[in-house]
Amino acid sequence: MVKKFTSKIKAAVFAAVVAATAIFGPAISSQAVTSVPYKWDNVVIGGGGGFMPGIVFNETEKDLIYARADIGGAYRWDPSTETWIPLLDHFQMDEYSYYGVESIATDPVDPNRVYIAAGMYTNDWLPNMGAILRSTDRGETWEKTILPFKMGGNMPGRSMGERLAIDPNDNRILYLGTRCGNGLWRSTDYGVTWSKVESFPNPGTYIYDPNFDYTKDIIGVVWVVFDKSSSTPGNPTKTIYVGVADKNESIYRSTDGGVTWKAVPGQPKGLLPHHGVLASNGMLYITYGDTCGPYDGNGKGQVWKFNTRTGEWIDITPIPYSSSDNRFCFAGLAVDRQNPDIIMVTSMNAWWPDEYIFRSTDGGATWKNIWEWGMYPERILHYEIDISAAPWLDWGTEKQLPEINPKLGWMIGDIEIDPFNSDRMMYVTGATIYGCDNLTDWDRGGKVKIEVKATGIEECAVLDLVSPPEGAPLVSAVGDLVGFVHDDLKVGPKKMHVPSYSSGTGIDYAELVPNFMALVAKADLYDVKKISFSYDGGRNWFQPPNEAPNSVGGGSVAVAADAKSVIWTPENASPAVTTDNGNSWKVCTNLGMGAVVASDRVNGKKFYAFYNGKFYISTDGGLTFTDTKAPQLPKSVNKIKAVPGKEGHVWLAAREGGLWRSTDGGYTFEKLSNVDTAHVVGFGKAAPGQDYMAIYITGKIDNVLGFFRSDDAGKTWVRINDDEHGYGAVDTAITGDPRVYGRVYIATNGRGIVYGEPASDEPVPTPPQVDKGLVGDLNGDNRINSTDLTLMKRYILKSIEDLPVEDDLWAADINGDGKINSTDYTYLKKYLLQAIPELPKK
């Protein structure tokens, strides 16, 4: 599938009522850097792995379903495989903001049309303005309209909605609810241009917390609902309802197609409307909460229905507002399109003993929860739950009654009933999408069979990766999910790293003892040590008795090549080293908070660090660091990586500062002039005929963003991704596979772990014809004589450390067993004595 923007360009018009509009094509690729074909896929974690704030069913075509992610783009359901297909993988690093999907709308008139309101943050964390993405082929290709304001796909209140809505009578018309006081916007040309609805009276007043940059903006206009019955096909819908994050007046109505607006009289006050659904019987159902979610949800909540035909408001809250058991927001809301009296609502973060999912078959007069209390601490469950598609959803822990594992979820900001199938239901959680296919069994006294419905969604924020030379091919550290051992790239792991931290932030292994690993993390519990060690390649972890001084956790970790020391650089403290697996720690001399540290992959005594614009080396296992006084360094460094098998070979990825390398342990560095930017750098198995590991980076070469590989120590590069596979933010970790040439693993911030392998039609590099000299010629004079025998003897006895030739192993390993020892000396001596006619052929 080709996911791209058309090359047509329109002038941006900033007028009083017309939004800036532009339709962009893909960036023009320079031909200076060669591209080679690669195939790309996700390393399967399974289950989603992140928060999916919304699910949208098309109301006129069966099985046309979309899901939106807060940092991972958007997906379309594939009914033939029952998996989700990612739709926005073409966005590169410079357009990462568009992986934050604020809202999604699927056209009920022309199901081929789908729209996305994209933009991740309203603050200054990312530079991009918001955008409306438009597709006429269900997300296969997209056009883009840039908006004159930002969207907040990963901001507070992101599960409220939907903010983007299509007029069901005249699908040229769309409405968009915005944040930050920007109000309500409208398009009359299929989303190409937009204008502010100046007559709309309330852009919202609610701010989650004005004291923090992330939470200080107005949540705004949060949903739009059309009353289809108020017009006829081909004519704009006259009656429109809009929900606003305002605790005084939150529900507004227009009866003249959006020309004028008034607050609906008699409406509830003091709460925020999370969702609004207008049923076919004229009832507008609304879920309310004290706060906007999705993390908090504590406080109070209500559920109301408004009879749009009589003007009557009816409180149908499952737990009375006055009750002490009413201690959470009501957020998710679903109405069965086959029966408007069947409704479902969810709690927003009740937490204990679990979430609440209520169902009513009489319009809210009575309710049933999906569980109820038995004899305390027992509970009676009206459901079964199957997590076989993502077994790690038990979080590796056991709960004490009345809690059980796995739970129903948390952050349940949206729930939907299939408009064509009353038995199918899906709902979102903070880690996956759950659902069932036998929902009506509940009404007959049966149990709902809940299962993971997120296959194909990979939305993890991955923070670090290692691919050791033995054991599992990949081990990860993952935000929110700690991390995993990935034994099979195509099958999700059965468990996450235990102990169960809140986020894994860094991982490393000992190059010469690869089963030894260290993991650093963040944790919600203060009594949990935020570093763990493993002696079996990450399958089991143990916590040390002590932590690095002054640490609150997180950060990065570097393990000595021989596993004898570990340096932890917490996010808030200076690096500290342990030589006894965390029993004791010592702050590393001459380094401070913010240092970037890595271990040499050959010499267990050596570590490297970049701190305050200087490069440092340690030769005593990380206890003390010394400034190498390397000249002309970049101002800052994102990652340091040392090359396995090459002592003293160090590479720096300095983002806009480029890519740097040293072959003398960091005393001198060379900036690679053929690399513009380098976010991360990693190494994998060398190409055939090469003795230097393949190098992988994400960055920019010849002004082209992408993923790149070098097989010749950085002399030349090839681009290994294409314009369909950008994956957004790819600046936390990259590593090649030391066992499979060409395979590379990349950590993304919202699209999980992606890996690439050469496509079948990529030519295998031809080994260069290099004259390494005669086998047995140890001094390079093109002769084999007694001088060479003497050199070999001295080398074996360690009276000399190096041979005069460039490749010691080639010249002196006579029998080709990978070692230089007495066997080779005997062969060479016999050859010189003419006891054998020739040396063994390698």
Curated annotation (Swiss-Prot):
Q: Where are the BNR repeats?
A: 134-144, 185-196, 252-262, 358-368, 533-541, 577-586, 616-626, 660-671, 708-718
Query: Do you know which InterPro entries this protein is assigned to?
Result: Dockerin_1_rpt, Dockerin_dom, Dockerin_dom_sf, EF_Hand_1_Ca_BS, WD40/YVTN_repeat-like_dom_sf, Xyloglucanase_GH74
The protein's Enzyme Commission number: 3.2.1.-
- The Dockerin domain is annotated at 771-841
Presence of the UniProt keyword NADP in the record = no
* GO molecular-function term, one example from the UniProt record: hydrolase activity, hydrolyzing O-glycosyl compounds
What positions belong to coiled-coil segments? Answer: none
Keywords in UniProt for this one? Answer: Carbohydrate metabolism, Cellulose degradation, Glycosidase, Hydrolase, Polysaccharide degradation, Repeat, Signal
Q: Where is the active site?
A: 70 (nucleophile), 480 (proton donor)
Q: Where is the signal peptide?
A: 1-32
For biological process, the GO terms are: cellulose catabolic process; xyloglucan metabolic process
Q: What does this protein do?
A: Hydrolyzes the glucosidic bonds of unbranched Glc residues in tamarind seed xyloglucan, producing XXXG, XLXG, XXLG and XLLG. Has low activity on carboxymethylcellulose, lichenan,hydroxyethylcellulose and glucuronoxylan, and no activity on xylan, polygalaturonic acid, wheat arabinoxylan, rhamnogalacturan, curdlan, laminarin, galactomannan, galactan, arabinan and pachyman or amorphous cellulose.
Which family does the record assign?
Belongs to the glycosyl hydrolase 74 family.
Official protein name in the record: Xyloglucanase Xgh74A
Q: Which organism is it from?
A: Acetivibrio thermocellus (strain ATCC 27405 / DSM 1237 / JCM 9322 / NBRC 103400 / NCIMB 10682 / NRRL B-4536 / VPI 7372)
